[in-house]
Amino acid sequence: MSLYRTFTANDAVEYARQFGGVSQPQTLVAAEEIGDGNLNLVFKIKDETGVSRVIVKQALPYVRCVGESWPLTLDRARIEAETLLTHARFCPQHTVTVLYHDPELAVMVQEDLSDHRIWRSELVKGADYPQAAAQLGEYLAQTLFHTSDFHQHPHEKKAAVSQFTNPELCQITEDLFFTDPYIEHERNQFDAALTPDVQALRDDKALKLAVAGLKHGFLSKAEALLHGDIHSGSIFVAEGRLKAIDAEFGFYGPIGFDVGTAIGNLLLNYCGLPGLLAPREAAAGRERRLEDIRTLWQTFSARFLALSDNESRDPALAESGYAALFLQQVWRDAVGYCGTELIRRTIGLAHVADLDSIQETEARLACQRHAISLGRTLVLAAPHIADVDALLARVRQSGA
């Protein structure tokens, strides 16, 4: 019989007292439910002075924004905890610390990051964290290299692919990225004024063939242990610091998916800034986003190459020049997945504040159309966008 039960605030406090690693656990007295996501309960556990000390996160057996009609496996809580623990082995400075996890209760205790801010919220406000892009590139390089065939022993990797098999969460990604936006589906959400733009996507045979190729890669390329949902809403930032959270979509997949999703969220902000800020501030913010993209890719690729030079364990993959060739394919994949992120975040189920928080209707629609158009361009042109400079040139040419 399952021991699972949905936590109340009191349950969360008691659990944190037992497993939060706090020196005086009896000082933990209150829980504040802060979860604004779709899949989990999240509690801040506070002491007698009102200071939040640890986080208790519990997976729900259904998609929260839909309800019990969309059930979900609780095993995703184990996968999230084990993904974060694995990533923390290789990049502890940029991975949230897991203090304890219990697969049966689908619950995890994490370090409190109240002194950090969600990166997306900061980007929407126009706040700049100039170190964040390089730190995200470092996180991606360390976690993806060390769980790839370059570094991981083949026997260990094959076992890990099984350990992190995540079919239900992958199904969500497969549907939301590669299927729903290109068909009529009840999960899709967009303003009626965008109907002609959406229909044009659905009628675009070349686009749908390119998306099919990206989906096929997502299904078949077990290249490394991905975060699986690495957008600006799953990243905490503070001055000089960055931490990745929310890894329940973790699985072994194409490295370009994580890289492309990260770049895509910077481009979503780029598309939204003219509707969020005054013209001069928006223009300056856009230049910072493009520089963030350049920094992210250059940091990721340089670190991945350095790691491959020094830590590759497979003698064939360690051949001089091979890692650079491999990264060319990662780059092409990343540009394509970036495009699908732009499209699905604009017309699919899970939208972003970078676009949806724009108050003026015509400005919001213009920014959304830009995201759709740019996403289409990147999916189609990915094989021909040779490097990050070419990508930034395409973005600048995209107008709006």
Curated annotation (Swiss-Prot):
Q: Which gene encodes it?
A: mtnK
> What top-tier enzyme class does this entry carry?
transferase
Sequence similarity: Belongs to the methylthioribose kinase family.
The family database entries (InterPro entries) matched by this protein are listed as: Aminoglycoside_PTrfase (IPR002575), Kinase-like_dom_sf (IPR011009), Methylthioribose_kinase (IPR009212)
Source organism (scientific name): Pectobacterium carotovorum subsp. carotovorum (strain PC1)
Q: Which UniProt keywords apply?
A: Amino-acid biosynthesis, ATP-binding, Kinase, Methionine biosynthesis, Nucleotide-binding, Transferase
What is this enzyme's EC? 2.7.1.100
Q: Which Gene3D superfamilies match?
A: 3.90.1200.10, Phosphorylase Kinase, domain 1
Which protein are we looking at?
Methylthioribose kinase
- Annotated positions binding substrate: 229, 344
Reaction equations catalysed: 5-(methylsulfanyl)-D-ribose + ATP = 5-(methylsulfanyl)-alpha-D-ribose 1-phosphate + ADP + H(+)
Chain residues that bind ATP: 40, 57, 111-113, 246-248
Subunit relationships: Homodimer.
Kindly list the GO molecular function terms attached to this UniProt entry.
ATP binding; S-methyl-5-thioribose kinase activity
GO process terms (BP): L-methionine salvage from methylthioadenosine
* PANTHER family cross-referenced by the UniProt entry: METHYLTHIORIBOSE KINASE
Q: What domain of life does the UniProt record list for this protein's source?
A: Bacteria
